[in-house]
């Protein structure tokens, strides 16, 4: 009789424990937000967009956030971009994300294909320019000349896109520098071989050539210059 009583108590305890586990882990529908950043994980500008989203997700159990940082040097052709997109889809849950957030114009190369994988998915583009261009130029780290530029407004006609434009104010910064340093006669821009830096170099050199011909301009690339040589 005592053994039956003990067995009953153990069974009830196990049953209660199982019910508590079920109660503490209800199946919830989680809306995932996919964030793709063309910048490094430590970039302050990129994090100013990412941090609020991740914070919101941490405070709401029905929202999840996935952040992917691109290594643009590792993407050399469209085949590698396609493979990268396949890896994205494999890492995410079976259900499509609720929306995709792109940070940095270079990340826009994924818009078209991800829209094919998840038709009409809401996309938020946070970029420095209101245009994009041929994927091949961006992947290979070449600036997009004016004749090849595609306005984001054209993409909005066929995709569910919202553009958050973050103007670089190149001309305004040049004017401010001239006011603060009246004796300035040369502008040096230090960048690398990524599309973003190459586009900045192209635009900056064109503006100086057209509006400030009295200024000398030089682009120093990390690809060909060591940090020590700058000092």
Q: How would you name each of these model-derived features?
A:
Residues 2-4, 21-231:
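Short hydrophobic alpha-helices and adjacent helix-cap/hinge residues
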Residues 8-18:
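Bacterial N-terminal signal peptides
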